[in-house]
Structure formats: structure tokens, C-alpha cells
């Protein structure tokens, strides 16, 4: 459980400038107001939430029976798994190398996978860019990711970006302190304000770290933002939570019904009640032999058995809930544990996944713009220039993504072959390798292998030409390869 913060205590921190107090107070208030709802959604994602029982069909002795439904996690992970960031591309080779280094030093691909799950859980996540201390082994630029449980921001509608933001950097992890925040960073257009609270103290102390970026070094990853909701919405919507509660209650009802259906209900007509009262309800329920005597009139009690109940209504209702959940989240119903008696065709499987693929394409487009701004901020911090100066160079930076449709290698190779036959010059482009599913690192290795193979072929041609005194093609290139080998 994550404890919140006290807005007034932080807004009156020692050393905090008067002109920044209202901004800090607003940020802390937003964080506190949204924390409970974000923790609730995290609870559904982690399957820690128990639904409210209706008190109709569940006996009191079984109302605490726990059932976990992973549908909210599936709603998040099914989309997150199709959003695979694969670095940046840039027409400027020097900038491309810088960005590759930044991505590698910050493990940004792995960090993005974590951030996108937080984004889909809570509607948004945040990336921050700060300068690292290279003297202690840190990278020149540090890119950090925070979920909405640890961060909040104020939106500037006119500039279409964050006006100011707050992140919880560190917490008190000692027992009985409930993860209380001890270090908070506030990001503004001119400064990073470190506000810390020493352990066992109630006073906060502010420290200013000015930067010359001219903008807040914090960027949101937002899912389905609208004009009214600039920070988007969660994949775990109210409908998802309600359906999950209903599914858990249905699962409990099915569990209870299954226990009663293991032995059909029996009855005795005309038996002495005192004889039956000697048996407990459980013994009467599971007992296979009844011993009863005739009544005073000499009549023998009539034994009977009720028709055994069916689990089909429970199965049908769970299938109905899964269909509604699938419609709400675009997750194929087959991924929710509902198996069809008739196998689906390849076309039907693709059609079921198409809405989720479209969601992933939209998600990648939105996150691609955010990651581009993060890349520009990282370059500005690394070069110690303003954000405007980096923009003035007009670097053509774009985020690169794996295909969210996740086609098979065979089908993708077949489609790319047809494209190359129609447009032959594409065969010389790296895009062909990317579309075939090769990662950025694999593309670089393939290009290195190709260059070495070309050099070896040129050397063989040179030696063959000397033996036969025949001129060789690409003599200038060959001389360059030989010179490079001598220098190496």
C-alpha cells in the first residue's frame, strides 16, 4: 500500500520560493486526489480486489471464498504486448548514433515496456529527463519512468504539453512507515526542485537545480487523450471493473453449486422426523445408505432423489460476461478462457484481433510523438543546449516500432517479396529488414556481416585480377578496404 502526501507540508518546504508554492500545492493536490483511484485500478490488475457479495445465493460460511479473475490484467497486457518500442531512427547519422547510445545506456526499450503497462493501467505514465553524473559512472542523460501512482502533472492546453510535474523519487521503506514519500522532484520550465524530508522528520527542505531547457523535462505517455481529458483514460474502466466483479461472483456461485452437485439431493416421505434429526445435514448429504424403520401404521417411508442440477447456466453466464468484456476491451474472447467447440478459421482469428491491432497502432502513434520529445530533450541535456536550439536543427527523429499485428515470418517474407518485385530499390533499404521482424541490433549486425562479406569478395577479386592481370571493378573502394585493413 502506497501512502499519499500532505500537500500543505510540501508546499511550505524550507527553501521553496514563494512564487512556486501555489504550483507545488496544486501538484500535490492533484496527486493526492487521484492516488486512491489509481491504487484501486492497480488492485484489479494485481487481482487483490474482492467483489461485494449480493447476499443472495452464497451461504454465510462461503462468502469469504476467494476467487481471482485476471481479466483486467489481460485488458492491459494484451495491448501492451503489441506496443514494442525498437529505438529511434534519424536521417542524421551522428544524431542516430547518439540516440542509440542513450537508448542502450538507459535500457529504454525495457523501461518503455514497464511504462506502457502503467500507462494503460492508470491512463498515463510519465518519462523524465535529467542530467547524470558521469564522474560516478552514471550516463550523461538519465531517462526515468513513473506510473501515475508515483507522479502527477498540470496540463498547459495552449502549449499542448506539461506545465509542471511532480514525481515521488524515494520512499521510507522501514516497517510501520507505509512507504511514505521522502524525496519528491518538481519539474518546471526553468528548474528541477528537489524536495526532501529526512527520516524521522516532518519538515521538507527544497533545493533548486536550474536548467536552460525552456520547457518542463517531463513527458506524459497518455492513452486515448481527449479535449476534456488530456491525461486520457485507463484500460481498466468502470465497465471492466464491474464485469470483473460480476465474473468473480459468478465463479464463486459456480464453485458452491459444484459442491452441491457432487451428490444429488435425496428425500424421504413418511419417515419419522426424529430418525432424521439424528443425522447431521452433512451426513445426510453425503450418506449413501439410510436406515429407517416403518412408522406406527406399518407404512414404509418412500425414498426419492431430486434431479441433479446443471452447471450449464453458470457456464453460459460466464461466457456472456466474457463476450461483454471482449466488446469493452477488444481482447479476443478466446484469450479470456472461453473455448469454442468449432475451431476458428485463420480469417476469423485475424478478424478477432484486428480491433486490438488498430488500438495498438493508435497507441504507438501517440507514444511515438511523446518519445520523440523525450529524445529531443535527451539530446539537449547531453549537449547542454536549450530545447529550442535542438528544434532549430530540425532533426528528423522518429520512434521505431515492431509490427503490432505480429505476422508470422513466412507471411511477412511473402508480402515483402511481392513489394520488392514491384519496387526493386526497396531491397537496399533497412526498412525491408525491419518489416521482416529484425530488431535494431540485428539489423546492425547484418549490415556489418554484409560489409565484411563485400570486402572479402573485393579482396578475392583483387588477387584474381593480379594473377590474370585483369582490371578490377570498384578499384577505389577496394583500395579503401585495403588501407583500412593496414591501419587496423
What are these regions (language model features)?
Residues 447-488:
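Extended, compositionally biased alpha-helical segments that mediate assembly or anchoring
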Residues 406, 415-422, 426-446:
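Membrane-proximal bilayer-interacting regions
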Residues 13, 21, 135, 139-143, ...:
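Charge-rich, acidic-biased intrinsically disordered regions
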Residues 113, 120-121, 126-234:
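Extended, regular secondary-structure scaffolds
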Residues 338-345, 438, 442-456:
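Short linear loop/turn motifs
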Residues 109-123, 127-128, 254-259, 310-409:
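C-terminal amphipathic alpha-helical
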Residues 204-351, 400, 404:
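Extended, charged amphipathic alpha-helical segments
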Residues 1-145, 462, 478-488:
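Extended, helix-rich architectural segments
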Amino acid at each position: 500500500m502506497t501512502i499519499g502526501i500532505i500537500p500543505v507540508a510540501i508546499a511550505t518546504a524550507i527553501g521553496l520560493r514563494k512564487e512556486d508554492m501555489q504550483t507545488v500545492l496544486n501538484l500535490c493536490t492533484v496527486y493526492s486526489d487521484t492516488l486512491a483511484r489509481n491504487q484501486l485500478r492497480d488492485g484489479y490488475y494485481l487481482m487483490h480486489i474482492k467483489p461485494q457479495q449480493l447476499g443472495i445465493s452464497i451461504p454465510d460460511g462461503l462468502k469469504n471464498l476467494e476467487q481471482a479473475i485476471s481479466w483486467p490484467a489481460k485488458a492491459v497486457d494484451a495491448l501492451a504486448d503489441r506496443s514494442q518500442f525498437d529505438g529511434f531512427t534519424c536521417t542524421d547519422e551522428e544524431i542516430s548514433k547518439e540516440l542509440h547510445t542513450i537508448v542502450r545506456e538507459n535500457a529504454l526499450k525495457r523501461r518503455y515496456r514497464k511504462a506502457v503497462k502503467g500507462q494503460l493501467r492508470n491512463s498515463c505514465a510519465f518519462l523524465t529527463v535529467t542530467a547524470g553524473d558521469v564522474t560516478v559512472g552514471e550516463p550523461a542523460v538519465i531517462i526515468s519512468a513513473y506510473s501515475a501512482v508515483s507522479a502527477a502533472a498540470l496540463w498547459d492546453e495552449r502549449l499542448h504539453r506539461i506545465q509542471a510535474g511532480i514525481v515521488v523519487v524515494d520512499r521510507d521503506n522501514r516497517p510501520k512507515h507505509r512507504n511514505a514519500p521522502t524525496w519528491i522532484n518538481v519539474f518546471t520550465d526553468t528548474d528541477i526542485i528537489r524536495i526532501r524530508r529526512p527520516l524521522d522528520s516532518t519538515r521538507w527542505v527544497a533545493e533548486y537545480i536550474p536548467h536552460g531547457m525552456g520547457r518542463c523535462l517531463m513527458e506524459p505517455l497518455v492513452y486515448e487523450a481527449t479535449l476534456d481529458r488530456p491525461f486520457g483514460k485507463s484500460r481498466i474502466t468502470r465497465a471492466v471493473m464491474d464485469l470483473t466483479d460480476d465474473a468473480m461472483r459468478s465463479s464463486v456461485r459456480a464453485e458452491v453449486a459444484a459442491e452441491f452437485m457432487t451428490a444429488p439431493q435425496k428425500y424421504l416421505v413418511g419417515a419419522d422426523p426424529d430418525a432424521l434429526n439424528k443425522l447431521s445435514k452433512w451426513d445426510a448429504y453425503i450418506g449413501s445408505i439410510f436406515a429407517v424403520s416403518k412408522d406406527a401404521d406399518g407404512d414404509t417411508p418412500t425414498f426419492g432423489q431430486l434431479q441433479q442440477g446443471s452447471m450449464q447456466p453458470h457456464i453460459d453466464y460466464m461466457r456472456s460476461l466474457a463476450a461483454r468484456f471482449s466488446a469493452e476491451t477488444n481482447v479476443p474472447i478466446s484469450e479470456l478462457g472461453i473455448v469454442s467447440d468449432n475451431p476458428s478459421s485463420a480469417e476469423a482469428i485475424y478478424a478477432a484481433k484486428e480491433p486490438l491491432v488498430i488500438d495498438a497502432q493508435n497507441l504507438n502513434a501517440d507514444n511515438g510523438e511523446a518519445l520523440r520529445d523525450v529524445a529531443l530533450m535527451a539530446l539537449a541535456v547531453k549537449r547542454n543546449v536549450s530545447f529550442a536550439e535542438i528544434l532549430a536543427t530540425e532533426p528528423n527523429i522518429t520512434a521505431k516500432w515492431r509490427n503490432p499485428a505480429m505476422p508470422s515470418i513466412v507471411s511477412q517474407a511473402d508480402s515483402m517479396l511481392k513489394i520488392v518485385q514491384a519496387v526493386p530499390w526497396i531491397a537496399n533499404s533497412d526498412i525491408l529488414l525491419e518489416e521482416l521482424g529484425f530488431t535494431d541490433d540485428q539489423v546492425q549486425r547484418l549490415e556489418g556481416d554484409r560489409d565484411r562479406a563485400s570486402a572479402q569478395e573485393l579482396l578475392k577479386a583483387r588477387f584474381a585480377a593480379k594473377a590474370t592481370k585483369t582490371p578490377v571493378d570498384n578499384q577505389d573502394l577496394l583500395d579503401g578496404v585495403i588501407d583500412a585493413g593496414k591501419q587496423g
